[in-house]
Amino acid sequence: MPRVKRGVIARARHKKVLNAAKGYRGRRKNVYRIAKQAVMKAGQYAYRDRRQRKRQFRALWIARINAGAREYGLTYSRFINGLKKSAVEVDRKVLADLAVFDKQAFAKFAELAKSGLAAA
C-alpha cells in the first residue's frame, strides 16, 4: 500500500478557513484553530441575521408609515385597515418610501384610507 501524503488537502482546508477569516483581529485571523471557530460563529450570525433583517426592515417600514399616517390624523392600524377596506393593495415597503420621499402621493393614500374607514 502506497504512502499517503496529506499536506495538500489539509493546506487547502486551512487556507479556505484563513481566507474567510481575513479582516478579523488578533489571532482569529492567522491561527487555524481559533480562526475556524471565529468563521463558524460568523456563519451562525450571518444565518440568524439574514432572517432578522426581514423582520427589522418590516418594523422600519411600519414605523415610517405610522409617522406618515399620524400627520393625517390616523394611526398605523387604522391607516392599513382603511386601505384594505378601500381595496388598495400596496405593500409596506412602497408606502414607507412614499411616506419619506413623496408626501403628496402618501397624502392621497391617507385620503383613500379615510374614505375607506368612513364607508365602513
From Swiss-Prot:
MF-aspect GO terms: rRNA binding; structural constituent of ribosome
GO BP: ribosomal large subunit assembly; translation
Gene3D superfamilies the UniProt entry points to: 6.10.160.10, Ribosomal protein L20
PROSITE patterns, sorted: RIBOSOMAL_L20 (PS00937)
UniProt keyword annotations, A-Z: Ribonucleoprotein, Ribosomal protein, RNA-binding, rRNA-binding
Task of the protein: Binds directly to 23S ribosomal RNA and is necessary for the in vitro assembly process of the 50S ribosomal subunit. It is not involved in the protein synthesizing functions of that subunit.
Similarity comment: Belongs to the bacterial ribosomal protein bL20 family.
Protein name: Large ribosomal subunit protein bL20
Gene (name only): rplT
